[in-house]
Amino acid sequence: MANRLTSGLLVLLTSHTPLLAAQTSSSRSDFERVQDSVAGVSDTVRLRALFRHSDDPVRAGVIGIRLGELGDDPDFSDAIGRFRRATRQHAKDAAPWFGLGLAQAKRSEWEMRDMLRMGSRVGLGTLEKSSNAYRHALGIDPTYVAAAIAMAQVDLSLLDTTRLRTARDLLRRTIALVPNAPHELLLVWGRVERASGSVQVAASAFERFLAGGGKRALGLLELARCRLALGQASGDAPYYEGAALDDPEAIAEYRADLQVIAPDSVLHEFDSLHGQWRAAFLHRFWTDRDHFDLRPEGERLREHYRRLLFARSHFPLTVSRRFYGPQDAFRSGSVEVDDRGIIYVRQGEPAERLRPFIFGAMPNESWRYNRAEGDLLLHFSSGYDGHGGGDLYDYRLVQSVLDLRGAEDAPRDQLILSRQTLSPIYSHMLNWGRFGSANEAARERHIGATSIWVSTTTDSHELQFRHRLGAVADLIAIGQSARGGLGHFVFGIAASGTTWQRTTAGVEYPVRVRLVALDRHDRAVATLDTSLVIQHDHALTEKEFLVGRVELPLPPGRWSYRAAIQEGDSGGVLLPPDTVLVAHNGEVAPALSDIAMGTPGRAVPWRTDAGDTVLLAPSALFREKSQVVIYYEVRGVRTGAGYRHQIAVLRPGREDGDQRPLVALSFEEVAASPVIRSRRVVRLDQLKHGSYIVEVRVSDPEGQQQVRRRVIHIIGN
């Protein structure tokens, strides 16, 4: 079979045909015909003979490319040489330039595979030459579709924004001159438009791609990428529609977009699903993140594609090889973006970004992220020093500002001084004594290492506020709702920093509360996003707190929860996560509710369905010598049976032992209904400043106990 194919090829290549310079269209078709003829030939001896005896440099160049693919000329130098000769002989013909671009692209691949070649940009220079050759071909013939597609693919891989803008302009000209642009051309045109920043034009290109009958799943994803990056909710529908189509090429693209933030367990589940099940899985994946970050549904998906586009535009990895050293604290393996891009896609825009110039140090940056559980501090350094390193265009994560490339050659005080706005720890490193400074330096390194671990293994879209408010809050599960339990989110906002509006009745404070309860998989079991107006007869002083309460129906169980409080247009706070235990309804056994605690004038009142007034404190802080009102409920008791109540205040850490209570109160009560509602006052007169445990035990006639505990902190007046 190979011999017959080669013989036919010999006839084709040795037949007398006009010179390629005759007409551009005919030379292009002749080029493609020869290219198709040699594609299936693997006899290098006959191909080499044809190459030597061919008097047409373009045809010889096509054969040379095939020889290179078969390993007979691995660096494609023969093909490049023949195509260069063809560009000189047929200067007004586009086909030789197209062939030269193909050969140089092949040579670039060979250079990148050669591990003996040193440097971080191996093969990229040749790839740029390939792109230039394609551009020359388009300069001669703007309708040369194959050259336009090849140029776009090369420039997309180079990640050079300047080259992409030029490629965009050339593609626009080709699109305008080709009446019925093929699907492949529309696809790469849209991708180049998006990569060069013209996202709206890219969306139009993909709409044309879909309207013309291009691959539907791929077209829907590309259209969704554009709309989502622009923050448009209209991108949701094509995203999920495309995910439900079992197109291998499109599904690989979906997976690549997901892989930058998803752990292996999520990717494994994604790989196992098909059709609508895959689309439903993606919807749940993104919606879970919306709920976790207290965002409206769909916002996390749009933010993800905005970040991807921004990272690829601003933090591209314009090297072909990455060499790591001992001070590289993280090895992403990415070939698309540097470590700044990795962090940006996962964590978003930093609250503060420093890019100082320090004499002796390589280019570097530091980012700070505001987080409810503790800020993240991240340092990036490019270049190299005596400890190794990479490239000036490859920013790497390092644990400490003292690990920046060239830090040993830079003034230490200038390195530290340049980061003072990020954290007080840098002032301590600079100004404290020898041992204090060393301890702070060790702490700064630990913070850096922890920040790298958190930021490279998680993703976040936490709410950010221009002005951070001082606030305390608590979620107390007591009472009943249609879902089982009732959670009371009680909050107190420090008046300093709040805004108010005057009314005829006094002043009012607008407050927005966002709250989510999560299971152990961080999936929402209940959410709340509500606004309320708190009225006062006068504006609060700086030492006062704005207090309020909202209700969240909760199913029985132990849940973690996250909450954000916003007051006015720009002030707010995201609170650290906490947990709440919601008692069951008592159908199987007695169930003890949460413990509500409060002092008159320093708590929010709640009126129960039985008409009782309960005081709910927004925090666990109580002043010394306070009289604390305690309220709890026991559901599922037997009417007429006696129950023993024990309320105690204990020292922390020993509440399970036989220690003597610091404060104790016990009593018997006969249940008058299936629900016991108990309200008692506990005096804290004898307790000093510090932390304590308030414990409530309720025993049934058989001696079975229900126990609840709460931590309180006693402070001075």
Q: For the regions a protein language model found, what residue spans apply to each?
A:
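N-terminal leader/linker segments that initiate helical-solenoid repeat arrays
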Residues: 22-69, 73-77, 81
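Structural marker of alpha-solenoid helical repeat scaffolds
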Residues: 53, 89, 140, 177-178, ...
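Residue-level recognition of tetratricopeptide repeat
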Residues: 56-58, 93, 144, 181-182, ...
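Short coil/linker segments at helix-helix boundaries
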Residues: 65-88, 92, 102-136, 157-169, ...
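Residues within mature, well-folded domains
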Residues: 158-159, 195-199, 215-487
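Intrinsically disordered, low-complexity terminal regions enriched in Ser/Thr/Pro/Gly
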Residues: 406-717
